[in-house]
Structure formats: C-alpha cells, structure tokens
Amino acid sequence: MTRAAAGIVYAVVFILCLVLGIVPTAIFVSVMSGLCCYEFFRMTRLDGKMANERMGIAAAVVFPLSALGDSMLLNALLFALMLAVGIWYVWSPRTRISDVAVTLMGPIYTGFMLSAIVLLRDAVPGFAGALLSVGVCASLWVSDSFAYIVGSRIGKHKMVPKISPKKSWEGFAGGILGSVLIWLILWATHFYKLSLPYALLCGVVVSILGVIGDLIESRIKRGVGVKDSGNLIPGHGGMLDRSDSLIFGCITAQLLLMIGGVL
C-alpha cells in the first residue's frame, strides 16, 4: 500500500467514526491511544526505561472510553492511574523514579490527551457535532499537508534542524494558512457561536500547538535514535507518527472553544 493510499484509508476510517457518533469515535480513539502508548513505551525501552507497560497501555485504552458522557470519569481515571502507579512504585524496590515518570507519561501523553476528540464529538449533538470534530482534526491534517508542500517548495529557514531537519519557518507559515482555511469553513457554516476573529485565532493557535506536538514526538524519536515510532501505517510510520499533532492540537481546540463559549 502506498503512502497516499494508507493516509486516505486512515483518514476515511477516522472521519467515518466521527460521523457515526460518539460511541464509534470513542472506540476508534481508544484503539488509537493504545497503539500510540505501546509505541511510546517501545521507544522508551530503547532508552533503558522499564515502565509498567500493561498498566500504562490499559489506562491509555480506557481514558477515551471514560470520556463517554461524563468528563468526571476521565478525572477519576487519572486519579486511579496516579494511585496505581504509586502503589506499584512502593512495592517494587527495583523500580526507578524514571520508570514511574515514563509509566505516567505514556497514557497521559496519549490516551488522556486524545480523549479531547471524544469530548469534542460529544459536546455538540447531531451533524453539527460531527462537522466540528471532523473540522478540528482536518485543520491539523491540512496544516501538516500545507506545511509539507510549502516547506518542500520554498522552505529555506529551518526551525529546529537538530530535532526535525525538514521543518522550516516557511512551511510553518503555510501550515497555519491551511488550518485557518478549515476554521473559516467552520465559521461560514454558522452552526456555531464562532465569530470571524475567534475562528482566525483558533486556526492559528491550533496549528501552532499541532506543530509543538509534532516536535515533541520528534524529540522523543531523536533521543532514542529511531526514525519512526513504528511501522503500522505504510509510508507514515507508526500510529503515534500520525497522531502527534492531534495530541496537543485537539485538546487546544477544545479549550479554546470552551473559553470562547462555543461549547
């Protein structure tokens, strides 16, 4: 399967789940989170960290499911994870504090953060909710695509060459433009209490946080000496490689929409 075909299949399945409703969305994000967490632990293993992988992956899988209907369950699970990891640390003399930190970071970085997609889908009923959640994710995908196209054509000024050599400031600007275009479409539907200036702000900020998410994952990969987090998706690497911008971008969108009174 080619890179383009793999990317299309991933996007179609993702969008279909968002359109079908909150339960398919939660199940898809749950599976995605579990795979991302597994890949995260796989990379940290290369750095000598011995996380409690079963506990971490289980939490990553359950986080999005706990976001169904009541965000308080999400907070309760976060407390339960902290408690369980603390008990594991107390009763495991050989466990290092770095192992504890990685065990906590894995599911929080993946499952907890990605649960924002479920909360977004659940916040607005019907077609408008499906469109909003698809639009938020699409703004990050389009941002990535625009950044790649612009950066590969005219990118000359590198952002952080030691972490992500291909990223340029020109591509960064192109990515923001792509994200803003999607947010303008959301504004133009008039389905939401979204003013034009606030739609522009959301487009810019969400794109920037998506790039930060991408750079964080690139830093992890660079630190452990791997090119991709995995090989699950042909031409794209692992699930974490496909989700890195969503991890920070979607929760940023959710917070901005809550602050702006849209949700």
Locate predicted features.
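Interfacial loop-to-transmembrane junctions
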Residues: G223-L246
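Hydrophobic transmembrane alpha-helices of multi-pass small-molecule transporters
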Residues: S179-V180, R242, G249, M258
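Membrane-embedded alpha-helical bundles of polytopic integral membrane proteins
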Residues: M1-V204
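Hydrophobic side chains within alpha-helical segments
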Residues: A6, R42, A147, E217-I220, ...
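Membrane-embedded alpha-helical segments of transport systems
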Residues: S143, A173, L240-F248
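Juxtamembrane boundary at the C-terminal end of a transmembrane helix
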Residues: L255-L263
